[in-house]
Amino acid sequence: MENIHDLWNRVLGEIEKKISKPSFETWLKSTKAHSLRGDTLVIIAPNEFARDWLDSRYSRLIAETIYDITGEELLIKFITPPNQSEDDFEFQRSSKKHRKPYEESTDFPQSMLNPKYTFDTFVIGSGNRFAHAASLAVAEAPAKAYNPLFIYGGVGLGKTHLMHAIGHYVIEHNPSAKVVYLSSEKFTNEFINAIRDNRPDDFRNKYRNVDVLLIDDIQFLAGKEQTQEEFFHTFNTLHEESKQIVISSDRPPKEIPTLEDRLRSRFEWGLITDITPPDLETRIAILRKKAKAEGFDIPNEVMLYIANQIDSNIRELEGALIRVVAYSSLINKEITADLAAEALKDIIPSTKPKVITIQDIQRVVGQHFNIKLEDFKAKKRTKSVAFPRQIAMYLSRELTDCSLPKIGDEFGGRDHTTVIHAHEKISKLLQTDAQLQKHIKEIEEKLKQL
């Protein structure tokens, strides 16, 4: 194994991609590798509060990340600076040893799923309502509702939560069901290891004999030809045997680069649904649910402050809440809006960029093409109105966080499929139409000046 300090830096680099910036900077950034004793990696935490939090929340993630990098199974032990002697430490109960892939039971125990990610703990809002409904339908009737179910959206918006929730629901209602959740990176790494060890049949048996396959971040298969080939056959086997497949990505299938057309086509067989960033009301609801689950007593004004400042994704939002609570505990002061501002000053930009709304887009597009605002919501189909309306829908999809149904509502209650059609049409035209490119550029420049 490589030098433990180099290894720890690599581990931190991988974990930084998986968790929110506030969580990483609060809990992991200041940690250091201390030593490796047998199969236990000892990590220095800055204080006892951080040590206990890391042990209860991050041991499993760290162990899995180390295994992904090295193929080694290590126990994780956190210590604090005044107590760095390794002679007398005891293993923490939460530091589990992870078995190697082909020593794992083919029963795929429920422990593979995060117990906190259930439908009950999922906060429904306008940006995720359709994805939640589709996920619940799949969980209630695997391989009968939508197969595959393809969920896409930005980092930290709840895709993984829904996938785990599906797994929990299926197991709860059918304890004998074989449910497996994994990332595409883990699928790739296990496939490589199986080829290296000349055990491809073990790998295939493992993933082609399940009832529900939940595979996260499928975009990372892009460019990996052999792995795509293997997943193609895994997909076919499961689909032909009426087994449920749920896939997540940060973008829709058609936008994943270097993805084989035959895979792209299969991903589009079922239902494709997106998740967009939560609106203010949903962000506040998420904070309330998180605070209740963790036993935090947070004043409403503090939750409102955090929700107003963090609007990117749920992971960042919850990470900010944890950072505020940690800061309050460490300096032994009551949680207030002022304390929250102090705790979050390093992660909140001093000036936030203006949020562009659908109304902004309609106004600027209307001025550009000399059409009235009410025309965007009217039923007129003349080209002089319909084409600018499609451009406005396209820009609403590109420049706002609004869901497809929300965009449709703002254009006279049109169906979300109309928005999809408009976006696809303008996207295609932009590839060859220089005049349209000029229009879009001019409109975007005007929007930036608002």
From Swiss-Prot:
An annotated GO cellular component: plasma membrane
Listed SMART domains: AAA (SM00382), Bac_DnaA_C (SM00760)
Region ranges (Domain II): 79-111
Renumbered residue ranges of the record's region Domain III, AAA+ region: 112-328
GO molecular function, one term: ATP binding
InterPro entries: AAA+_ATPase, Chromosome_initiator_DnaA, Chromosome_initiator_DnaA-like, Chromosome_initiator_DnaA_CS, DnaA_C, DnaA_dom, DnaA_N_dom, DnaA_N_sf
Keywords linked to the UniProt accession: ATP-binding, Cytoplasm, DNA replication, DNA-binding, Lipid-binding, Nucleotide-binding
Residues of the signal peptide: none
Domain IV, binds dsDNA, as annotated region: 329-450
Pfam families referenced in this protein's UniProt entry, alphabetically: Bac_DnaA (PF00308), Bac_DnaA_C (PF08299), DnaA_N (PF11638)
Region entry Domain I, interacts with DnaA modulators, spans: 1-79
Domain of life (superkingdom): Bacteria
Subcellular location: Cytoplasm
PROSITE patterns reported for this sequence: DNAA
Binding, ATP: 156, 158-160
Thylakoid is among the record's keywords: no
GO BP: DNA replication initiation; regulation of DNA replication
Keyword ATP-binding in record: yes
Role played: Plays an essential role in the initiation and regulation of chromosomal replication. ATP-DnaA binds to the origin of replication (oriC) to initiate formation of the DNA replication initiation complex once per cell cycle. Binds the DnaA box (a 9 base pair repeat at the origin) and separates the double-stranded (ds)DNA. Forms a right-handed helical filament on oriC DNA; dsDNA binds to the exterior of the filament while single-stranded (ss)DNA is stabiized in the filament's interior.
Subunit architecture: Oligomerizes as a right-handed, spiral filament on DNA at oriC.
HAMAP family: DnaA_bact
Family designation: Belongs to the DnaA family.
Description of its domains: Domain I is involved in oligomerization and binding regulators, domain II is flexibile and of varying length in different bacteria, domain III forms the AAA+ region, while domain IV binds dsDNA.
Protein name according to UniProt: Chromosomal replication initiator protein DnaA
Species the sequence originates in: Geobacillus sp. (strain WCH70)
